């Protein structure tokens, strides 16, 4: 497989994305149209809120699905809905969740009338070659770090008491 890995830094420098998109030939990988497409998808991943976690439904883990179904089921039961309706509510909620967490299901930021999948399909038709989004990772500065909670007054008092 040919293609490129795009490293995109969103303006302001707080968000970055690594994205791999494959094509069939190195000729296509070198074209401006393909490179622009890859950059646009990287920009989408950087700007999308909620941020995509998976490429498509097939990549969603069973653990994630079960957890989300349990949450949706508990919420539906808490409202007093009958059991027959609860499962339909859970199914609808899961479809909504897929639109949030699956990149190809999301509305494309640069043209919200299209999903990312529809935009990908239009680019495949235009370029005339199979393209596939292989993997991506979004990085947000400071994400996952625990912020220290210092109390300056207590710190000064502790030092004065020594």
Enumerate the language-model features and the residues they cover:
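N-terminal assembly/interaction segments in proteins that build large macromolecular machines
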Residues: 1-162
């Amino acid at each position: 497989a040919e293609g490129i890995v795009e490293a995109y830094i969103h303006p302001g420098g707080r968000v970055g994305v690594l994205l791999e998109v494959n094509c069939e030939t190195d000729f296509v990988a070198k074209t401006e149209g393909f490179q622009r497409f890859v950059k646009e998808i990287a920009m989408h991943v950087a700007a999308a809120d909620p941020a995509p976690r998976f490429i498509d439904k097939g990549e969603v883990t069973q653990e994630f699905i079960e957890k989300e179904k349990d949450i949706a089921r508990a919420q539906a039961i808490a409202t007093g809905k009958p059991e027959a309706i609860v499962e339909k509510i859970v199914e609808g909620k899961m479809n909504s969740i897929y639109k949030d967490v699956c990149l190809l299901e999301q509305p494309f930021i640069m043209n919200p009338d299209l999903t990312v999948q529809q935009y990908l399909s239009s680019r495949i038709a235009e370029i005339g070659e199979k393209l596939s989004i292989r993997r991506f990772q979004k990085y947000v500065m400071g994400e996952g770090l625990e912020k220290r909670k210092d109390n300056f007054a207590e710190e000064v008092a502790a030092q004065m008491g020594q």
